[in-house]
Every structure is written in structure tokens, then in C-alpha cells.
Amino acid sequence: MAIKPKYVKQLGTLLLEEYPQAFNTDFETNKESVETLTNVESKGVRNRIAGYITRKKGSNTPPSASA
């Protein structure tokens, strides 16, 4: 797993603080939200930010018990 660039973390964190209701654990909806809330033109950067937000939103769920 790669370390995300600083600009991805900064923008992702800013978006989560400003618009927490606009994001959830679904990558596709987060991708659309990033597109509407920012002026990012690059598809790759948009997807990286959406992926970062998706991981941050999903990290609040407890791990499933496996055994």
C-alpha cells in the first residue's frame, strides 16, 4: 500500500471537515462528491482523494470477527 501524497491528505481532510455529510464508505459516491465540491481536473487526483476519504470514513467501523 502506497503512502498518499501530502496534497491528497490535506484536501481530503479539509473536505471531510467542511462537508462530512457529503461522504460515506462508498467510493463511487465519494468520487462524485469530490468532483462537485472541488475544481480538481485530473481524474487520477480526484480518485486518489475519493479513495483517501473512503478509507478514512471506513476506518470508524470495528473489524469483523474472523474465527
Curated annotation (Swiss-Prot):
> Matching InterPro entries, A to Z?
Ribosomal_eS17 (IPR001210), Ribosomal_eS17_CS (IPR018273), Ribosomal_eS17_sf (IPR036401)
Q: Which SUPFAM superfamilies match?
A: Rps17e-like
- What is this protein identified as? Small ribosomal subunit protein eS17
Q: Which GO terms describe its cellular component?
A: cytosol; ribonucleoprotein complex; ribosome
Q: Which family does it belong to?
A: Belongs to the eukaryotic ribosomal protein eS17 family.
Pfam families referenced in this protein's UniProt entry, alphabetically = Ribosomal_S17e
Keywords in alphabetical order, please. Ribonucleoprotein, Ribosomal protein
Q: Name one GO biological process term.
A: translation
HAMAP family for the chain: Ribosomal_eS17
Q: Which gene encodes it?
A: rps17e
What organism is recorded for this protein?
A: Haloquadratum walsbyi (strain DSM 16790 / HBSQ001)
Record's PANTHER family?
A: 40S RIBOSOMAL PROTEIN S17
GO terms assigned for molecular function: structural constituent of ribosome
